[in-house]
């Protein structure tokens, strides 16, 4: 199935849910497939992991896809771009931009063992934050019929990050507001609290849930 995903991306095939004998039965299977898929892509591109994405951080999106938690994915080092980068649409099947608050991990957070990380642990481990975009490729998915386990297996559609200037985290990051403009016209607005109430809660979920490697200094 991981090889099939790679082929779909290589040919820019339309996103299709895995079904029948290939149906993904639970979230554990979904993340196992994700790791296999990403491992192949890393091997092909001679790349490494630079960090993680966290998706479905709003209750509305979780309800839409029938899941009660966020989802995660890996970000590859060669897919990190700096502000001002030019991205070719032809490199994607259907590229999308998602506005993000990007955090930079300032000290290692080893994999959870006996005690889960608290909010204060996360807050003290983050060295700086940046506005940015996540690049996704939904491959013309039918949003009325998305299997969340297939989405997770497909690395949650992540195709990289565009990173702005990092600054020390504001005292009230939950209250920070952002505006997306196109040609001077406001398209959308949002605030830090839209992400699980505070962006650091999303990082807390990630540190406690997803990664066997832990979060390392320098990770996004």
Regions found by a protein language model. Name each.
Residues 1-198, 212:
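Catalytic-core "active-site belt" of small-molecule-metabolizing enzymes
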């Amino acid at each position: 199935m991981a090889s099939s995903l790679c082929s779909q991306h290589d040919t820019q095939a339309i996103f299709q849910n895995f079904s029948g004998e290939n149906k993904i039965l639970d979230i554990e299977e979904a993340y196992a497939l994700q790791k296999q898929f990403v491992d192949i892509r890393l091997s092909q591109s001679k790349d490494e992991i630079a960090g993680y994405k966290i998706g479905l951080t709003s209750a509305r999106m979780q309800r839409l896809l029938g899941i009660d938690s966020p989802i995660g994915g890996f970000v590859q080092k060669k897919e990190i771009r700096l502000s001002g980068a030019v991205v070719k649409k032809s490199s994607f099947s259907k590229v999308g931009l998602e506005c993000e608050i990007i955090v930079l991990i300032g000290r290692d957070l080893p994999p959870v063992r006996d005690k889960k990380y608290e909010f204060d642990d996360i807050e003290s481990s983050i060295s700086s934050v940046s506005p940015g975009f996540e690049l996704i490729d939904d491959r013309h998915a039918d949003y009325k019929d998305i299997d969340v386990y297939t989405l997770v297996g497909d690395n949650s559609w992540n195709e990289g990050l565009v990173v702005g200037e990092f600054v020390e985290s504001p005292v009230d990051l939950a209250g920070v507001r952002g505006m997306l403009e196109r040609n001077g016209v406001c398209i959308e607005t949002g605030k830090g609290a839209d992400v699980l109430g505070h962006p650091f809660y999303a990082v807390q979920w990630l540190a406690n849930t997803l990664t066997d490697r832990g979060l390392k200094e320098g990770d996004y």
